[in-house]
Amino acid sequence: MEKIKKQNNIGSYSSDKDGEYKKFRFSKTSIRGFLLKEYEREVPIIVKIQSYRNKFLDFYFKMASILGEEVFFILALPISTWCVATQLGVELCVVLALTIGGGNILKNTFTLPRPPPNIVWTNTAHQKDHGLPSTHTASAFGLTFYFLIYTYFLFPTIGESFNISLLSMFFIVLFWSTSVMFSRLYNGHHTPMDVIAGLIVAITSILATTYQLRYFIEGMVLSETFLFGPMLYIAILSAILFFHPQANTGPTPAYPETGLVCGASLGSLISLWLHAQHPCPLMNQELLLLEANYDSIVSTIHSIPLLLHGSRILIGLVLVGIAKVFSKKFFFFAYDLVIRANTNNEQSQPITTVSFDPNKKIIVTPTIEAFSKLFVYTCVSFTIVSMPYLFYYLNIQTSADVTRYY
């Protein structure tokens, strides 16, 4: 185990500082020390799991791991919003922020290492952030099981429309999420302790959203005053990013990812607030039928449900992609102007560089990168939840656009 112990030196506190905190039984340092010992004990478990490797499992768990990526869920969230219910998409964004954002805060707090790559085989690219908890596990369990709870327990009429029994949907969701969880072990990215911690984060996020946060969202959405609605949420998320712990081992993707998922929840909530204040018009079915008689395209689209939903998803994803590109360019263009207006001082090599002048580069600190993702994904999720207005004018509206559950 000597090699493993050597890996643990990364990001660990000095022995002097450890001694300083020994009197605090529940200090961060003592907890981290306990978790590090457990980490050392569990690395051989990963080696044992990987002793059963074969080509099929390599491929299967590589694909399963993708199903837990936050980018995958952000691409999949529009389907829930446009094909099931607008409010469902918003609440899933909140669960995404809780699971990944909360997980990243824990990652940067305890800075526990991942299984050492010189001992453990990795199926995919080596992860640059820390280990505990597994945010793939947290987001996979959190989002899929909240989807199940929302559609079969909170609003069972939605589940009935799927023509899938509750038991069947439960096993689908369980198979999906457990595949993601085991992929993190098989691929050599996490120890059992990490995925168990991710599962705890997921359960906590589901319970918090189901029994408390969804009522907070309802009160915020129905508030006629912008100050006590979206502005309150903006203040909360800004405080989270300002006080987000930074890893003492150097910058990692965890902090910017928190900005990303916070932006996803913020934009969707702002748009839902606008929906409450200015509801999307309900398409007149008689006029639609009359127009369909004269417009063969409208008639064809509405006669084939798969074509109707496919058209909505295609149009929506194109506009979401445009919103993402232009919001990012706008943020860094504005940031570039502010920086150049206030200083001409050349700094060290940036973590991320975005330049509109090929001869000059601007410096992007981790904080700026996190807030850039907050802004960009606020615009992205705002566009997603605002699409029902466009669908109305394009005559491709469905019940998902106008049904209210608050």
Swiss-Prot record:
Its EC number is 3.1.3.-. Keywords: Endoplasmic reticulum, Hydrolase, Membrane, Transmembrane, Transmembrane helix. Pfam families: PAP2. This is Probable sphingosine-1-phosphate phosphatase. Residues 133-136 are annotated as: Phosphatase sequence motif II. Signal peptide: none annotated. Residues 183-194 are annotated as: Phosphatase sequence motif III. GO terms for molecular function: sphingosine-1-phosphate phosphatase activity. One of its GO terms (biological process) is phospholipid dephosphorylation. One of its GO terms (cellular component) is endoplasmic reticulum membrane.
